[in-house]
């Protein structure tokens, strides 16, 4: 796939698989994301993937579209995780991430509400509200492949900051 095809694919996509690693142990988990040039934005509650990305910010995200065994597309992004904490210097980027993610789906509200409910059940006397955790993956490389009955499989690869 060409660079433009990869970018257009990511702009249409919202579901991918995030790969991270800690102490030579890989971990892959499905995520929802929003794409803007050079970045993927995501939302999470604290857990294993956040712990691991904090210790090793090098990550990959794969997103695909499969119609059948001979007609599919796949884009893999490699990049660097950055947490967007609830602090004034990150507020603009957090707002952008929230706006982009809310445009596409409200799945995170259910997950976030469930996490708050579990917290209240395990700690009934504490009513702490844990703020949502937004993050950015700075895209440093991208490859795309596709297969279609009447086309030749294509691939583009590039490194460094994308423009």
What kind of region is each of these model predictions?
Residues 45, 55-64, 71-82:
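Active-site-adjacent structural patch at catalytic or cofactor/ligand-binding sites
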Residues 1-17:
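Short, basic/aromatic recognition patches
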Residues 69-163:
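Charged, gly/pro-rich active-site loop segments
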Residues 11-13, 25-26, 74, 128-130:
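Short solvent-exposed loop/turn micro-motifs enriched in small/polar/acidic residues
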Residues 45-48, 101:
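Short, solvent-exposed aromatic-acidic interface loops
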Residues 13-45, 61-62:
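Short beta-strand segments
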Residues 38-39, 57, 140:
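Beta-strand-connecting loop/turn residues
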């Amino acid at each position: 796939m060409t660079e433009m095809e990869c970018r257009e694919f990511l702009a249409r996509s919202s579901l991918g698989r995030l790969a991270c690693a800690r102490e030579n142990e890989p971990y892959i988990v499905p995520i929802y994301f929003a794409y803007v040039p050079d970045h993927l934005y995501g939302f999470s509650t604290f857990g294993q993937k956040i712990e691991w990305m904090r210790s090793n910010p090098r990550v990959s995200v794969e997103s695909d579209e499969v119609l059948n065994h001979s007609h599919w597309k796949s884009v893999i992004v490699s990049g660097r995780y950055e947490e967007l904490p609830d602090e004034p210097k990150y507020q603009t980027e957090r707002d952008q991430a929230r706006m982009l993610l809310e445009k596409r789906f409200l799945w995170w509200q259910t997950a976030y509400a469930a996490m708050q409910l579990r917290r209240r059940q395990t700690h009934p006397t504490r009513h702490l509200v844990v703020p949502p955790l937004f993050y950015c993956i700075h895209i440093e490389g991208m490859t795309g492949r596709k297969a279609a009955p009447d086309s030749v499989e294509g691939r583009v690869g590039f490194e460094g900051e994308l423009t």
